[in-house]
Design a protein with these regions (language model features):
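Short, acidic loop-to-helix structural element flanking the phosphoryl-transfer center
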Residues: 1-29
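Asp-based, Mg2+/Mn2+-dependent phosphohydrolase catalytic module
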Residues: 15, 19-20, 31-36, 41-143
């Protein structure tokens, strides 16, 4: 598993966005599809240039019984945080896995176009979107 790190890149702007969210007092959850155990998810977090401690919580197959794109996945996260959907923002790069289900759960969304996954070539114009710089601006103005 650790050899997969060679295929994963880092974007220092990801750390900047996470830090800005934390500085603003937002809880930050890594809502990754929970197909790995915690030890593997923690490795993947580090491969991205972040630390598990950067997150309030992150999903793994040990701690959540739903996966994307089920809206119940997002509802479980909201319950775990004690948060209301209208107060939360889901940032994702996968049109199918991240955007629709999160919106169905009542969350606001931002489509990160860096490493965009759009398997079916869906129209993405309805979503607020952009690269990490645009995301930083969106986060700073969001509330």
């Amino acid at each position: 598993f650790q050899q997969a790190k060679a295929f994963c890149g880092q974007n220092p702007k990801a750390r900047e966005v996470v830090a800005a969210c934390k500085k603003a007092g937002y809880p930050v959850v890594l809502a990754t599809n929970p197909i790995f155990p915690a030890v593997a998810t923690e490795s993947r977090i580090r491969w991205a240039g972040l630390e598990p401690e950067d997150f309030t919580w992150y999903t793994t197959y040990e701690n959540i019984g739903y996966s994307k794109p089920n809206p119940a996945y997002y509802q479980h996260i909201l319950t775990r945080l004690g948060a209301q959907a209208e107060d939360c923002l889901m940032v994702g790069n996968d049109v199918d896995e991240d955007m629709g289900a999160a919106q169905q759960a009542g969350l606001s969304v931002f489509l990160l176009t860096d490493c965009l996954i759009n398997r079916e070539g869906k129209d993405i114009t309805p979503y607020p979107q952009g690269d990490f710089d645009a995301l930083m601006g969106f986060v700073q103005s969001w509330a």
